[in-house]
């Protein structure tokens, strides 16, 4: 090689991707904060997001929310029905117990056959009235 020939230029290095540059800039702190609270996130300017979602996407989100609400409502109704069933079972047991005690009290005063006749008559009347 002679000294008069120019040296070949080094191959140009590819530039970093433009999408990676802003992310790296946001992540890297820009020196010390004035108030010294370096553990806080860097504040960004307020950008309203009002017109940024498409109408179709909003419709999809509304459908999803409606489905979720429907499922929640169904689950609440099932839970309430189970609760009412338990309450009704307790009431039925208490009523049966009171009726049994009433007949026992009656049996102390009256003859056994007379009490049984009354039981049958009351059952008939109960069936007719219900």
Curated annotation (Swiss-Prot):
Keyword Disulfide bond among UniProt keywords: no
Domain of life, per lineage: Eukaryota
Q: Where is the composition biased (Basic and acidic residues)?
A: 91-109
What residue spans carry the Pro residues bias annotation? 7-19
Q: Where is the composition biased (Low complexity)?
A: 20-29
Q: Which residues form a coiled coil?
A: 58-118
Where does the protein end up?
A: Nucleus, Nucleolus
Q: Which UniProt keywords apply?
A: Coiled coil, Nucleus, Ribosome biogenesis, rRNA processing
Can you list the GO cellular component terms from the UniProt entry? nucleolus
* Biased composition annotated in UniProt, kind: Basic residues: 110-130
GO BP terms, alphabetized? rRNA processing
Region Disordered, annotated ranges: 1-55, 91-130
Instruction: Summarize the protein's role.
Output: Involved in nucleolar integrity and required for processing of the pre-rRNA for the 60S ribosome subunit.
Indicate the family of this protein.
Belongs to the CGR1 family.
Q: What is the recorded name of this protein?
A: rRNA-processing protein CGR1
Upper lineage is: Eukaryota, Fungi, Dikarya, Ascomycota, Pezizomycotina
Q: Which gene encodes it?
A: CGR1
């Amino acid at each position: 090689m002679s000294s008069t020939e120019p040296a070949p230029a080094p191959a140009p290095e590819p530039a970093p991707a433009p999408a990676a540059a802003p992310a790296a800039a946001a992540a890297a702190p820009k020196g010390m904060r004035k108030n010294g609270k370096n553990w806080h996130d860097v504040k960004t300017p307020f950008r309203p997001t009002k017109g940024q979602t498409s109408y179709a996407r909003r419709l999809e989100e509304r459908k999803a929310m409606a489905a979720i609400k429907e499922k929640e409502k169904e689950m609440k109704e099932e839970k309430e029905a189970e609760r009412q069933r338990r309450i009704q079972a307790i009431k039925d047991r208490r009523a049966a117990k009171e009726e049994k005690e009433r007949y026992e009290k009656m049996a102390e005063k009256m003859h056994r056959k007379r009490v049984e006749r009354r039981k049958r008559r009351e059952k008939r009347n109960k069936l007719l009235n219900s």
